[in-house]
């Protein structure tokens, strides 16, 4: 009896601590595809969402009416704007989506091909195949003509779709896990399994800054004005850098043995960094101090075991709320206290 009482007390304390660390009272929620999504991107201001639903995903949710394919959603008006359907004739799973900085274009990718979409016109700009590696991450410039791909063969490929120019960045010695392209398409940041992240010129391929980690670099992000960069590895190290000088500004303060990010985005002014994790955690950080200011837990995928959801994307909207988009097919907004 005494042992049971001890375990009860420990369980109660654990729940209390979890309640202290997480604030789960979202102020708005959009349940767009409750059978789950394979990828889900937000626009920079969280006005729009673009997600892909795979037929048969989370089959336990048989009452869902959302169709398989690519969906473009207006979160402010809470309605679907465009149903794009399948990316290719094989109905391949779309695993990566990025919306351009100005919200006009998007790039979506399967393992072997990528498509560019004009979100304003609601049309496809084309489909391109990649044969020399598996696509692991993508980004697109604001004009919709320059794209960046991170591949499993260690290449980061910059392509100008208007001219056909292709630049292969070959500095990485192993898989490229994460890429980011500046809004004007002139600069790129890439991180890979070789423990390095590189900031480089897309016109010349010249390396401008080199950032080294002790473990594989799993997530990177560029601040839109070119002030800062985030590089995070597969352990618990995440650094914010001054892009002009290459100096380390700070390290994100975390007590976890392992802190992996599935998404990351700086606020427009660079004051904050928002991150999402594969376990459904959303966090707000102070860019200069590296201190965590807020933490939330995203709604898990229904009937999933264990109950969790991958945070595919994060953003800060015009109401200064943190917004997340997850594999549960749900977007949530939280107030910044």
Residue ranges and their predicted role:
Residues 2-7, 14-337:
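WD40-repeat beta-propeller superdomains and closely related acidic/aromatic-rich repeat-like regions
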